[in-house]
Amino acid sequence: MRKIAMLLVFGIFLTTNLISAEEGGKVESKAQEKTMEVAVIQTKKGNIIFKFFPDDAPNTVDNFKKLANKGFYNGLKFHRREPGFVIQGGDPKGNGTGGPGYTIKAEFNMKPHLEGTVAMARSNAPDSAGSQFYICLAPAPFLDGQYTVFGQVIEGIDVVHKIAVGDVMEKVTIEKK
């Protein structure tokens, strides 16, 4: 009788642990399925998709999303390309001097400037960014901590390398991925 009772207790213990492990696995799967918002820049050469860093640059991320959602970037050209360094866009004047009509406070952070890093372009004044952004073509560690890094290309880095001065951002959208 004692052996039967021990087997019963062991069986209940084992069953409880298996159920807990299964439920834990389901919770973990749901966490892994968590979606993120991305920016999709559509060009004739293909799409550039980048994820945001809202914890490192919350106001900058919000500003970019706001501009994209109201169609600000649609039809703008990439006005700058420095081989082996960056491509730059987001200027409605198309010459590097334009913006949305306001500036935002810098959110300098220590996110490294790697290939595909997306950051805000600005003048010499730290709080002069508005809508212009650049995407690194190669690592640029000398920029670290001096510019607001707010994203990283996750798809389309080949497209980034094909962008030339005058290429158009046909449409920029914010999507869930």
Predicted segments with their positions:
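Cyclophilin-like peptidyl-prolyl cis-trans isomerases
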Residues: R2-K177
